Amino acid sequence: MTFPEIVKTTLWDIIDEMSHSLSSFVKNPDKDFIRKRKLDFKKMMHLIISMESGSLNHELLKFFEYDSSVPTGSAFYQQRSKLSVSAFRHLLKEFNLKFPLEKFRGKYYLIACDGSEFNIARNPDDPDTFHEPNGKSVSGFNMVHTISLYELCSKRYLDLEVQPGRLKNEFQAICSLKIGRAHV
């Protein structure tokens, strides 16, 4: 198996393990992902991780190999809303534990921290992320701000904090990123 295949298999194996203890990774453990659906927990995690920059309908069609009974965008949104943020934190943590980090000169971790802003789906009713129309945007836009910890030698993300665009506070985000949480 090539290294990329090992990485992908490892990722899918972690998601498979997670699917056996859903209560830690969903918002309502008593009812979320209990019934059999086309977009079960494993497929949702696989789909979200493998999505590219296409429209949601295109991504769903690709994921389900252009099957005529592909789930709708609405079904995707409903299932996605059941996932807890802890599912992705756990996946990142477990994945990083499977591949030890490289140390610079055998004893140091070189870690960078940087922020980025991302536009998200427009929703003028969300005051925490919506930015009013201005000279650059005629209809306004919604945005989130992320702060990431990145280990330079291993070329891996260790931790991430997401904040609503209008409430961004890089200093607070940096303080909430914990090297310990990243398992360095």
Where are these regions (language model features)?
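Conserved, well-structured functional cores that handle cations and Mg-NTP chemistry
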Residues: 1-181
